[in-house]
Every structure is written in C-alpha cells, then in structure tokens.
Amino acid sequence: MQFQRRSLMIFLLFIGYAIVYIDKTVVGFALLPIEREFSLQPEQLGYITGVFFLAYSIFQIPAGWLNDRFGFKKVLCSSLFLLGGFAMCFGWLGFTFGLLLTFRFLAGMGHAGYPTSCAKAVTANFPVEQRTFAQSILLSSAGLAMTLGPLVAVYCLEHIGWRGSFASLGILAFIISGCILWLVPNPQRTLPVSSPQQQSVPYRQLLKSPIVILLFIAIFCLNIPSYGLMAWLPKFLVQNRGLPLGVSSLVAAAGGLGMWISSLCTGYFVGKYMQGKEHKVVCSCSLLSAVCIGLVYATSSAISASLFLFFGYVFLMASFVSVFTLPMKRLPTDVMGAAMGIINTGGTLGGFVAPIAMGYLVKMSQGYFSTFVFLVVVMIVSGLVILPLAGKTYSPVREAA
C-alpha cells in the first residue's frame, strides 16, 4: 500500500514537473513568432525569458519557507494553479511587450514553489537511500519535456498559434493541480514554529555553510547553458544555420532525450556506486559537456548537432542531478525546504542571466560565437567549483541545526 501511495505521488509530481518544463521549452520556439509580431530586438527577447527566472529567483527562498511552514501539498497545488493562470494570461492578454514581461514574471512567481515542494515531498516520504533515485525521476521530467516539448510546440505553433499554445498549457496545469489536490495525501503535521526568530536561525547558518555556497554556485553555472540553449537554440538553428523549424525541433528533442536518459541513469548510478564521490562525477561530466556544447556550434550538420547536443545534455544532466540531490543526503528534513530554496535560487538566477546575457552577446557580436564561448566557460566553472567538496564531511547537525 505504501509503495502504491509513493508511486502515485511520484507519478503526479512527475506530470506536474513536465508541465513546468514544457512551459519553459515552448517559450524558446514561441520567441520566433513573438519576434515577428512585436518587432523585438535580441535583448528584448532575452528579457521575456529572463524575467521569468528573475521572479523565480526572488520567490524561491520564500517558497522554501512556505513549504516548511504549511506543507508541500498546498504549495504544489498553488504553484501549478498560478503557473497555469498566468500562462493563459500570457497567451490571451499579452498584447504589448510590457504585458508579456508582466505575465512571464508572474508565472515565474508561481513556478518558484514547485521544485522545493517536490524536494520536500521526496524527503518526507522516502528513506535516505531512495531519495536520489526518486528525485532523479522527477528531474527526468525535464528530459521528457525537452524531448516531446519541441515537437509539440512546433505542432501547436503551426495549428493554434503561440497564444493558443500557452492557453492550452495553462488548462493542463489546472488539471494536474486538481489531481494533486485530490489524490496526493496530506503531509504529516509537524510542531508549529513558536516565533520568527527561531525559524530564522537555520537560514542564517545555511547561508554561512561553504557547502551550500558551493552548491549554489555550481547550480548557477549549470543552469546557464541549460536554460540558455533552451531559449536561444531554436533561433540559432533557424536563423543562423538555416534549418527549417521542424528540423530544429528534432535537434532540440535529441538534447531532451539525452537529458531524460541521463537523469534516470545518473540517479541510479550515483546513488548505488558513487556515494561520497559526487564531486568527481560533477567535474568530469561538466568538462565533457563543455566540449559537446562547443561542438554544437562548430558543426553545420543537423545530424551532428543532434548528436553533440544529445551527449552535451547527457553530461550536463549528470552533473545537475548529482549536485541537486546532495542536500537531500546531508541536510535534516526540517530545513530541507529552506536549503533547497537557497540552492535552487542559484539555478534560477542562472536561468535569469543566461537568456539576457546571450541576447546582448548576439546583438553586440552580430553572431553566436561569443554566446557559445560564454556557455563553454561557465560549464567548465561548474565542474571546477565543486572540487573543494572533495573529502569534506558535512554534519547537518553542526552546520544547519
């Protein structure tokens, strides 16, 4: 019975995560018709994507506190409901550049609670030895979304337009939110917090932890190429490499497939064979991913680009899963929402910086060479910054309690 309950919860959280990632995937392809409709400059397109992650970053830590205070189920449902509502507004009411920015910002605010509440749900319902695999299943939804998302996005853009695509996505988010509300059991009650001062102590100590800081930087660097490619790869392939939109969706889908496979395999492999050696996994995979990302730019063949992007995302996701699951092994449950909020804020800041920085680089250089150099460099940094964790023994009781 417990296995069935956990399986149902993971399935629903997985579908919700997929909706969240499809929302971010569709934007990259929707920028092409949006650019034509509003006659936008490259840096303005970057802001449409980046402002989503700005809101995501701002509300990430408050969302972690809400998880610790009110429970993961309420935050899960609220996040999907807000994300769906503002996705619909983006499609139906986004008639000016300012409104597009506003609705994407508000959607990012809604999205902020979902990753931390999923991490809280996994921590509360799974033993330590199963958490890496359970979380990797949820993170693999990114691969599913990036595999099917480009294909679905191009189909929807061609048949119902970018406005109808976002409206449909919002309806799906509403449906999944209702299913979670109805089918996922309520979390066990914990003792109420007696005062704000008592709750603030773990936050201050977590912010001083060198391990939390290093994980924050690593996630920041890893998400720059992840979200930067998600936002700009379709435009690069169509306008710079001259590929049809349908072919560019297949190239992007190859990267998503690599991400999906890697997230599932990495969770099992690291959880079973590489306990305590995660820094080696992160460093080696980050360097290999940097090489593959550089080769995506160097090739002019759609098949070669698909192959390099596939392996680039295989190694990138291996690094990401290893970094993202480390706090679940080292931190106590009562501060998990807060810790994941802090660390994941690094990732969302990477998502904010990446599309805007790439937009300015494209405009200033009138090309994409400098943008890919930027992606390669931050990928290398993500691997090197994790090396100081080698040999460290982290005690959550001493550092975070």
Where are these regions (language model features)?
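Cytoplasmic membrane-interface "Motif A"-like loop-to-helix N-cap segments
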Residues: 69-80, 271-286
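C-terminal transmembrane helical hairpin of 12-TM major facilitator-type secondary transporters
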Residues: 276-323
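Helix-to-loop junctions at the C-terminal end of transmembrane segments
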Residues: 60-71, 263-276, 362
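Helix-loop-helix hairpin linking two adjacent transmembrane segments in secondary transporters
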Residues: 137-184
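Cytoplasmic helix-loop-helix junction between adjacent transmembrane helices
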Residues: 103-144
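Juxtamembrane intracellular "pre-TM" segments in multi-pass secondary transporters
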Residues: 1-3, 187-215
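C-terminal ends and interior cores of transmembrane alpha-helices
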Residues: 81-95, 287-300
